[in-house]
Regions:
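Long, aromatic- and glycine/proline-rich binding clefts that accommodate carbohydrate-like moieties
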Residues: 10, 111-112, 268-271, 320-369, ...
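Glycine-centered hinge/linker elements that transmit conformational signals in sensory
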Residues: 155-157, 199-230, 273
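Short, well-ordered beta-strand elements
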Residues: 10, 14-24, 44-51, 74-75, ...
Length: 401
């Protein structure tokens, strides 16, 4: 079986290409960086195409383009969980093995592979961290929590402050979309469970996994996680945190550079996410990779762009301008970076502890099944055990097919 790859005659063609990614929250910093490329290579200009801010809709747009053989998209940004699906369907081409940059974190590089071949190059990795309202904790004279029990106690203490009795404790992204999959996976993994174990076996109905789901269900029931969070995606949760509706927030690092400037550094801080029952928090690995579409006409320019977009210079730029987590380990310890972005060591520790979402060619079906089963449990319409058992049956069917 011959998969499409970047070898042979078509590698010589150079001309204009497009770079396709989700919505840019950085206030035009992506375009600014592309302007540098366009000045340097006027015959191989890159135009930016921004898709939705939502992962599920981005994926749909990319699939529609691939299925209609559209040549509009050349280099595309893929959530790392989509790589297998796009490679298996031959919507993206194999990348030459010598593309791997020196110093890239190995586990991050591997997110671009499918069946032992490389189909995508990471340009940002990602793991969540805990944002906390420093101002509220100081008013209540409370330490930064290290455990789930501490989070509960800190929330109770802050609720005793004047006009604070209704503040939410711990926020996240619990709307019915990809964020829900990331958030529930963290509770399940932290409690010692797994949706699918390393051998590919469905284990979402194990006692440990059910405990993880139960912990989230209980947090909604007790209003530790505010009910409003059932509608929250990334930006909603950031708004909730900024406007004082929630004390702690699990979110990705992009929020630090792009949005919290208005809140001011004296009002918020970043810390590791809390352990649950003595088990260290297991963050969900995020990140985006760039891949070259099979329909791309100018594959030589596309590959040259991918190498430039994932170079150390570009990664440093995207770290400074968008607080994107870089793919190179050394950028997390570089003195001037840590001075500017003091959360980097916390983020690196989160990345090192992070676990991927289930690997599946039919990832779209897997994540939809997770959302369909878990959401009603969080709403209190069904219990954790029933949700887990229903999900296990559904996942077994998807994986078998």
């Amino acid at each position: 079986e011959i998969m499409p790859s970047l070898v042979g005659s078509e590698m010589c063609i150079r001309d204009r290409i497009s770079w396709v990614q989700g919505k840019d929250f950085s206030g035009g910093m992506v375009q600014k960086r592309l302007d540098e490329w366009n000045t340097k290579y006027p015959k191989e200009k890159v135009s930016l195409i921004e898709l939705s801010s939502e992962a599920d809709q981005q994926r749909q747009s990319l699939i529609n383009a691939a299925q209609t053989n559209s040549a509009a998209y050349d280099v595309i940004g893929l959530d790392l969980v989509w790589v297998a699906e796009f490679a298996a369907n031959r919507w993206i081409v194999e990348i030459p093995s010598d593309t791997k940059p020196v110093g890239v974190i190995d586990s991050v590089w591997e997110t671009g592979s499918y069946r032992g071949k490389q189909y995508a190059v990471p340009y940002t990795t990602d793991a969540p961290i805990m944002y906390y309202r420093k101002d509220f904790l100081e008013q209540a004279k409370v330490e930064i929590p290290k455990t789930w029990e501490d989070v509960k106690k800190a929330t109770e203490a802050v609720r005793k402050l004047p006009s604070m009795q209704n503040i939410g404790g711990f926020g996240g992204q619990w709307a019915k979309y990809e964020g829900l999959t990331c958030n529930i996976a963290e509770f399940i993994n932290t409690c010692g469970g797994a949706i699918v174990d390393d051998s590919g076996k469905v284990t979402v109905d194990s006692p440990e996994s059910i405990k993880g789901i139960q912990t989230a269900v209980d947090a909604f029931k007790s209003k530790l996680i505010p009910t409003a969070a059932l509608e929250w995606k990334e930006e909603d949760s950031r708004n909730g945190f900024e406007s004082g509706k929630v004390l702690f927030l699990r979110n990705w690092p992009y929020q630090y550079g792009n949005d919290l400037k208005e809140l001011g550094p004296d009002k918020f801080g970043l810390a590791p996410l809390p352990s649950i029952d003595g088990k260290a928090y297991t963050p969900t690995l995020g990140g985006h990779n760039c891949a070259i579409t099979t329909n791309c006409k100018n594959k030589a320019t596309a590959l040259k762009f991918v190498k430039w977009w994932t170079s150390k210079e570009s990664e440093q730029y995207n770290l400074e301008k968008q607080s994107n987590a870089p793919i190179y380990g050394e950028l997390y310890t570089k003195d001037e970076n840590v001075k500017k972005l003091p959360y980097l060591p916390t983020l690196k520790a989160s990345l090192d502890a992070a676990k991927g979402r289930p690997h599946a060619v039919a990832y779209g079906d897997v994540t939809a099944a997770i959302q369909d089963a878990i959401y009603p449990a969080l709403q209190g319409k069904t219990d954790a055990e029933s949700a887990a058992k229903q999900l296990a049956e559904k996942l077994k069917t998807i994986i078998k097919n």
